[in-house]
Amino acid sequence: MKQLLFLLLFLPLLGLSQPFTFVPDDNFEQALINLGVDFQLDDYVETQGIDTITNLYINSDSIADLTGIEDFIALRNLSCANNSFTTLDLSNNPVLYEVNCSVNQLTFLD
């Protein structure tokens, strides 16, 4: 009976989103800090702080990796021109409307 109660109470918690988003590129994270979205350079950003952002302008910030952009689920406009990343996967950004990723070294865009 205790095991059943435990499962009923904690099983729904497995579906909750992660509280932090992994952002391995220090320049990307620093750009988020400069925008007031993050506070500490530690490779993690609070997901609840980025999941409502609709516009993101991170041009000329020497960013080589945009890992973490997938958790910007409300993002409509992204300007990330003049950086140095080679891949950009925006397949998890369902409402994205406008992207400017010019002057990068893109070999893959999704």
PLM-predicted stretches and their roles:
Residues 5-79, 88, 94:
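N-terminal capping/linker segments that flank leucine-rich repeat
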Residues 97-103:
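Consensus positions within tandem repeat domains that build extended binding/scaffold surfaces
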Residues 107-110:
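Short, intrinsically disordered, charge-balanced linker/junction segments flanking boundaries
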